[in-house]
């Protein structure tokens, strides 16, 4: 867990370090500033390739691949995780909330599934375990692709204490590039992709807004669809 030291935030320290390095590459600056690299593996194609890039980019630093298990993803995610451990020749450390079993437990407790205030499950099952694990000198790697520069910028603005690296953006890799690289490596993509979903997210993901997404959920996971619909009806207008 990150703790602030006499008002000297990691972001301030990192920015000062960056400003002093002139023409050094971002990789070189990152390697000098960090004591370890933590790659946030999400059981998706992009995060798997981001892990591959990080391992290649930072051979001089300890690498930790960490996965925050929400308890609500497709069971095939475990198979993909195991395949990626073999592909990367590196173990994945599994982190999980000490309080909540899955997204359903969070929604029931919060009496809220998502909306303007965001989704409570993200904070409880993803952000919470991540923040409990991260440290002051970590270089944190996320699998933002070349199409997601805006998301990476927003993360930096909202998390100024984090030293963030986005190797897919640095290397100009798109989501389709990542999918192709996984397939070329002989790894079967997570089942959710093969069912037509764009991401290997929870079933269901309360942040999803598209009609197409919910049609796929209803088609492929009718029990979860009906359970979610019943929960939203029970919570009423205050729950969504």
Residue ranges of each PLM-predicted region?
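Nucleotide-activated chemistry modules centered on ATP-dependent adenylation/adenylyltransferase
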Residues: 2-240
């Amino acid at each position: 867990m990150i703790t602030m030291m006499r008002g000297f935030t990691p972001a301030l320290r990192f920015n000062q370090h960056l400003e002093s390095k002139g023409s050094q590459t971002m990789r070189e600056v990152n390697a000098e500033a960090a004591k370890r690299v933590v790659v946030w593996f999400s059981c998706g194609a992009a995060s798997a390739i981001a892990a591959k890039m990080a391992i290649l980019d930072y051979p001089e630093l300890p690498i930790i691949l960490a996965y925050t298990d929400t308890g609500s993803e497709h069971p095939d995610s475990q198979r993909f995780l195991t395949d990626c451990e073999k592909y990367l020749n590196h173990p994945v450390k599994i982190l999980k909330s000490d309080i909540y079993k899955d997204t359903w437990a969070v929604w029931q407790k919060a009496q809220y599934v998502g909306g303007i205030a965001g989704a409570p499950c993200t904070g409880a099952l993803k952000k919470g375990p991540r923040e409990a694990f991260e440290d002051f000198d970590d270089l944190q790697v996320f699998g933002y692709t070349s199409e997601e520069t805006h998301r990476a910028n927003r993360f930096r603005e909202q998390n100024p204490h984090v030293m963030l690296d986005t190797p897919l953006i640095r290397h100009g890799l798109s989501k389709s590039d990542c999918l192709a690289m996984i397939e070329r490596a002989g790894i079967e993509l997570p089942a959710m992709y093969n069912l037509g979903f764009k991401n290997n997210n929870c079933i269901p993901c309360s942040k999803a807004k598209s009609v197409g997404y919910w049609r796929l959920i209803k088609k492929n996971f009718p029990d979860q669809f009906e359970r979610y619909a019943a929960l939203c009806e029970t919570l009423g207008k205050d729950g969504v």
